[in-house]
Amino acid sequence: MSDHPTAYLVLASQRSGSTLLVESLRATGVAGEPQEFFQYLPNTSMSPQPREWFADVEDQSILRLLDPLIEGKPDLAPATIWRDYIQTVGRTPNGVWGGKLMWNQTPLLVQRAKDLPDRSGSGLLSAIRDVVGSDPVLIHIHRPDVVSQAVSFWRAVQTRVWRGRPDPVRDARAEYHAGAIAHVITMLRAQEEGWRAWFTEENVEPIDVDYPYLWRNLTEVVGTVLEALGQDPRLAPKPVLERQADQRSDEWVERYRRDAQRDGLPL
């Protein structure tokens, strides 16, 4: 029996480059079927809708750009069924499991894990262990340029496309809004601070990768994760996703930096 871990969990915030990593790991065929399993809200069974990211915002110039809320249906599945589904769907035939967790999803994970039998503890680390079924390799992906990350988020939340290219017509309707981007920057910074505080509190030492390094060295990073799982690092593929940012995103980033300097917005 291998002494290597048989699971990994990518820890991140939205638009940090985590999809680039997990899709490359998925492409190996031996590194699980990683999904963002913990994004679904129990009251709707859906991932957060655009307006839910701006729940405390009253500025109508922001809200008018976001799709209205859909009611959804509550997720009534027992905790054990929920756990078993996650373990089954995230695993490749060789037994390796993969997943992705954002900091804003950690309360949901901890809350749902409370109802599992034979808990190993009550905190986040125990919740991860008890839901995944073992102690996974933890990989922390972060993006030092939070302005670019926030612009990417703001554009995606308007188009509802989180990977690949959006519909050109819908993308053309997306609008720059400094206040919305500022809101997202504050949210993303809080998520990253949450991860780093938790690492310190729990003495967790993940594989730590920033987005610029990941983008330039994707095959190497995938190989590192494969090696940690006891898999052949030579299976790491060439990049399978293209960069979503384009000239328009770059223009929004530069425009926001100017607005932030002038108006005292977060950077």
Swiss-Prot record:
Query: Catalysed reaction per UniProt?
Result: alpha,alpha-trehalose + 3'-phosphoadenylyl sulfate = 2-O-sulfo-alpha,alpha-trehalose + adenosine 3',5'-bisphosphate + H(+)
- Give the keywords, sorted: Carbohydrate metabolism, Transferase
Q: Give any Pfam family that matches.
A: Sulphotransf
The active site of this protein is located at 36 (proton acceptor)
Report the InterPro entries cross-referenced here: P-loop_NTPase, Stf0, Sulfotransferase_Stf0_dom
Q: What is its EC number?
A: 2.8.2.37
Per the UniProt entry, the effect of residue 36 to A is: 100-fold decrease in reaction rate and 3-fold increase in trehalose affinity
Pathway stated in the Swiss-Prot or TrEMBL entry:
Glycolipid metabolism
Q: Name one GO molecular function term.
A: transferase activity
Q: What does the subunit section of this Swiss-Prot or TrEMBL entry state? A: Homodimer.
Q: Matching NCBIfam families, A to Z? A: TrhSuTaseStf0
Q: Which family does this protein fall into?
A: Belongs to the Stf0 sulfotransferase family.
Protein name, as recorded = Trehalose 2-sulfotransferase
What organism is this sequence from? Answer: Mycolicibacterium smegmatis (strain ATCC 700084 / mc(2)155) (Mycobacterium smegmatis)
* Taxonomic placement: Bacteria, Bacillati, Actinomycetota, Actinomycetes, Mycobacteriales
Gene designation per UniProt: stf0
